[in-house]
């Protein structure tokens, strides 16, 4: 009898030990799974931070003037918002082919508030910010290309404007109206070197015709891109 009783007790003890080991094993699996989830979550946060820091920023921000309900200068069938967008998109492609990350204030016919454009550039922490526009004059006599900067930014924006102006004139052979100072919103509210290039007068019939051709738009884009790269490589 004692032997049978001892065997029953041994079996019960063995079963309890097995249950205990099973519970311990399940607990350890739970802890391990929890730690893995925590690691994945922290890894996700780290990846998101890296993305925001390195990938969501941009080297260069391009601003195609006007857009949406704001057409800009509108002479006959030449609309400023359409021309500036085409030039900006071509410039973006050239700069990206050169290995730079480019952000655009707009990539289609969208209205963007003027004050939001420099805010966008500031969020991107870009090295430079370039706004592209077409010019106009009341009597139609205006002709040529000019680039603006603000003296509030010091020599950096002036140098950027010079490089863009020189390169665009070289690529287009347009009349050189030189660089000029102004306190436009996009110039003064951005935190980085900024320039605004007026690529020609829509009120001038010969320039208006040129500005609507793909070849001339490409020449302008090549000049703008070259000027930006020349400034960055200084």
Please report, for each region that a protein language model flagged, where it lies by residue.
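Short amphipathic alpha-helical signal-transduction/dimerization elements
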Residues: 92, 96, 165-172, 221, ...
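Catalytic cores of processing enzymes, dominated by hydrolases/peptidases
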Residues: 155-199
């Amino acid at each position: 009898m004692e032997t049978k009783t001892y065997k029953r007790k041994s079996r019960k003890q063995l079963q309890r030990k097995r249950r205990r080991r099973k519970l311990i094993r399940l607990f350890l699996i739970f802890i391990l799974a929890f730690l893995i989830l925590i690691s994945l979550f922290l890894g996700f946060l780290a990846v998101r931070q890296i993305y925001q820091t390195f990938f969501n920023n941009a080297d260069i921000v391009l601003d195609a003037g006007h857009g949406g309900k704001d057409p800009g200068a509108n002479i006959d069938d030449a609309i400023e918002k359409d021309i500036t967008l085409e030039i900006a998109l071509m410039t973006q492609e050239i700069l990206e082919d050169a290995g730079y990350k480019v952000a655009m204030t707009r990539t289609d016919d969208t209205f963007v508030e003027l004050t939001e454009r420099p805010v966008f550039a500031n969020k991107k922490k870009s090295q430079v910010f370039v706004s592209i526009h077409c010019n106009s004059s009341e009597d139609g006599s205006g002709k040529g290309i000019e680039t603006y900067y603000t003296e509030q930014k010091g020599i950096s924006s002036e140098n950027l404007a010079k490089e863009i102006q020189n390169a665009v004139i070289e690529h287009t052979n347009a009349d050189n109206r030189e660089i000029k100072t102004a306190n436009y919103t996009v110039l003064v509210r951005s935190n980085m070197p900024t320039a605004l290039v007026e690529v020609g007068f829509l009120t001038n019939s010969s320039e208006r015709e040129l500005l609507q051709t793909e070849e001339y738009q490409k020449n302008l884009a090549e000049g703008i891109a070259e000027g930006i790269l020349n400034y960055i490589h200084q």
